[in-house]
């Protein structure tokens, strides 16, 4: 072993502190190694007495063993030193005084800042590690024991909720109202006033969407002591009731309602697209449209298509790209608009129309759609357990009248009990246009089926073979056969026998209660049967028999639906108007005559009869 290697093996690093015992042990090892070196040199040197080769090997092995022990001891000492340093850092950390937090109020050119902390407003210095230019008003900062700003945090995420009354002229302050109707002026934190944030700002404060403009009625997260509003809190109850969307439904997706679509286009699109002509003829555009008719016949679908078509038409008029056409469809969930607290329903209605006005002020068409309109705007005075309609209806009337001088907004209502809606809403000047969405006849049913049974669907090889592989001819024949079966006045299609108050009787078939939703359900059943057939037989494709079987199943599911307790009320909802019905008897095969029930007294007819 060379001298350098020996010194490295038995040496100690300069920066390693050793105890007295460790030093003594190392010194003993050095002396012993020196003696061994002398013995080795005397054994192999030119003047020494020759010794046996075995003694030389023993001495070398002894030296290697001592070197290994010394190296292991050095590693142990290094690990112990590292542990001592880590413990010392932990002790120093635990012994540090507590840090305080405050809200940044403002910054100054001399690298000082105003901070609100512990109920006081103080001017403090900043650590050199803090970039003053990145600090933002309302931000939380950490202070050391000397009240020096040492760290910048995010904005406060908890606090009191206050309602915004208005934003003041400077744009940085706002008037808010607390829970006890206490008004106060607060500063708006940076996220509420800045449209973009600089690079290097904390990621928690960056958002892909720029903050929208604050509007009266917004809920704000406020620290009343510091006098700052940090965040706009979405109103869950209003967000749930109003769905802002750009509908992707077009008129081409709707079948069997050509005449009704033409009516609503005349009522809605013409005033928007040809405003100059309307002004020239001094013609006031309609404020609203009522779509009424039986359930499942496409009222909501038409309303969505109106918003989609209107956006594209206005984009064409302006010369914009129709693919980037923008419109808003505010879909109001009628029954959920009702609230047990006095004044809440009216407040929701005000907020809905306020949002519509804001969207329309940007030049974008806005459709405010009230589904199930009869549930919230029924005739005043008809309530049994509640008189909420006495205030809700006037609120809607005032909002509709307020739309008079506002462009790009139209109200569309949908109901299957238009007779229950308050007459003041339906009068000319409010919901001017009334369009009845009727049940589809055989011709309309073929049009609806063609929307669902397209040439892209897989068709069974046997059915295609009947038409020499002509897929369009096969699909057309399928539609004709299924419509003939659905609209045939045969015994299997007999549904009800109704008795009117004057004693007349009438037999009703399933076709009298058909709807677009039922047709879609028939097609969906057939497609499911085709999938099951593929799994069972391995032969893919839709067959006419799948459609015919689906009609039978659909009719069977509907045989128990007629309400025999209040037959006239049920008939009105189903779209049957005219003479009052007092008796219903089901005619479906296998049904017992006990399923029918006569209504003889006026007291049992319900509140609408």
From Swiss-Prot:
GO terms for biological process: modification-dependent protein catabolic process; proteasomal protein catabolic process. Pathway: Protein degradation; proteasomal Pup-dependent pathway. Residues 608-609 are annotated as: Docks into pockets in the proteasome alpha-ring. The keyword Endoplasmic reticulum does not apply. Keywords: ATP-binding, Chaperone, Coiled coil, Nucleotide-binding, Proteasome. The keyword Transmembrane helix does not apply. One of its GO terms (molecular function) is ATP hydrolysis activity. Residues 19-96 form a coiled coil. Disulfide bonds: none annotated. Residues 1-25 are annotated as: Disordered. ATP binds at residues 296-301. SMART domains: AAA (SM00382). Pfam families: AAA, Prot_ATP_ID_OB_C, Prot_ATP_ID_OB_N. Belongs to the AAA ATPase family. Homohexamer. Assembles into a hexameric ring structure that caps the 20S proteasome core. Strongly interacts with the prokaryotic ubiquitin-like protein Pup through a hydrophobic interface; the interacting region of ARC lies in its N-terminal coiled-coil domain. There is one Pup binding site per ARC hexamer ring. Upon ATP-binding, the C-terminus of ARC interacts with the alpha-rings of the proteasome core, possibly by binding to the intersubunit pockets. ATPase which is responsible for recognizing, binding, unfolding and translocation of pupylated proteins into the bacterial 20S proteasome core particle. May be essential for opening the gate of the 20S proteasome via an interaction with its C-terminus, thereby allowing substrate entry and access to the site of proteolysis. Thus, the C-termini of the proteasomal ATPase may function like a 'key in a lock' to induce gate opening and therefore regulate proteolysis. This is Proteasome-associated ATPase. It comes from Mycobacterium marinum (strain ATCC BAA-535 / M). The lineage of its organism: Bacteria, Bacillati, Actinomycetota, Actinomycetes, Mycobacteriales.
